[in-house]
Amino acid sequence: MKKMMLAAALAATSVLAVSAADVYVSISTGKKKNAGTKEAPLKNLWHALQKVENGDTIHLAEGIYPGNAKCNWFLIDKAVSIIGGYSPDFSARNPLKHRTMFQPLNENNDKKGNGLGIFTIQFDMSKPAPKGVNMVFDGLIFDDGQAQSYHPVKGKPEGVETGMWLEPPAKGNTQFPSAKRYLVYSATANRAEGDITFKNCLFLNAGNIAVNLNWYKGKVKMENNVFCNNLMVGANVYSSNPKPGEVEWEFEKNTVLFTWSRTSELSDMGFGVRTTGNVKSELEDNIIGLSVLTGWDNTKGNDKTKKIEAEGNVFFLNRGSDAQVTKSPSVVKVAVDDFEDDLEGNYGIEKASENVGLADPKAFNGRINTAFLNAFLSMKYSEKASLDAGKLNAFRQAVGLPQQGTIVSKVDMFGNRYPLEDALKLFGAMAGKGAQEIK
């Protein structure tokens, strides 16, 4: 009986692979009752996701795509691919010209449902986990800046379009607090086997980790993406498999800039990328800079379960360090010039060669928002404590309790919204390093 069930499952998988379909969606020209062809596209991505099967590919024309009932997120519960950047009639594809965008609005933050990310990848647990998957997400723009809430005046440097990002439940002049969610999230419980790829995408203004991916077995590839102005971490991959090496992560030719700390105290997290235990990681030809704490964090997980290669990357102006590792009981901060000597052969890092600082800052002339950059480089956090010396504190001190007082804190900026148009200019900033122009 078990053999029959296994054969049936394998047969079903092969049939899906053979009969994989292409579905076309256009927010501007499509209709719900259309067939989903180039000539008669569907209107909404969420509707297409309900109709497709494992192995299918959804092609998205330009436009801003809302979730079901404008809920700001999409459930991806099948092993499908989503390709964006098409003209409305699907006659041409250019992701930077024909922008396929996920740009939720703050006014819809009350319609979150249970999605932890704008894209929440969570396979149907009532069915066998998909095997041999090859999911591709290509040419998509994720910008959560319009769903956040910013202080109207505090932490607003000259020339920067918003004040500082506000941690919920605080809010500025918006209907709801900030959307503290991932841009892409894959659930820990997922047991899919195969490959998943993100390429030619922009991940911008996240109120949490931009891409937080859990994978069970296979290859995770992130290539030619821009991660800009996100909180906590630009990208990390976790293995939900107890066996080391079952998950491989290739992080190649990405640009990761302006990664903020977890809170406005600027002291916790703020990693461009993070490598973790049980994952074989390759970091190659990336640009990683302007992180609040460190460009590359390697303190998560058991070093003995890691196999990491970091080669040909460019690190610059990371405020705390270019990399950090755990040397119990301390965290060691390492500058890029010392990677080969201090990191290679230690901490699960097999290769750490040809990584350099930014030789020519002119590469970013006209590519980076100068007001935002100047404010970030000048940023500081300060606090002033003022204790009440009255009878209450005298009594508390006498019985060994801490005194109470007030703390006034000030930060020059924190997670302020970065302009979309400037973020798109980061594609192609440096030949051969970081995200290249999309062809």
Model-identified regions with their sequence ranges:
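Short glycine/acidic-rich loop motifs that flank beta-strands on beta-rich extracellular proteins
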Residues: 69-71, 92, 106-107, 112-116, ...
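Acidic, glycine- and Ser/Thr-rich low-complexity intrinsically disordered tracts
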Residues: 91-100, 302-439
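Right-handed parallel beta-helix/beta-solenoid
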Residues: 17-47, 64
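Hydrophobic h-region of N-terminal signal peptides that target proteins for export
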Residues: 10-18
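Right-handed parallel beta-helix/beta-spiral solenoid domain characteristic of secreted/periplasmic
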Residues: 80-162, 168, 172
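Positively charged n-region of N-terminal signal peptides that target proteins for export
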Residues: 1-4
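N-terminal extracellular ligand-recognition/capping segment immediately after the signal peptide
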Residues: 46-49, 54-92
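Right-handed parallel beta-helix
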Residues: 84, 133-146, 163-172, 193-207, ...
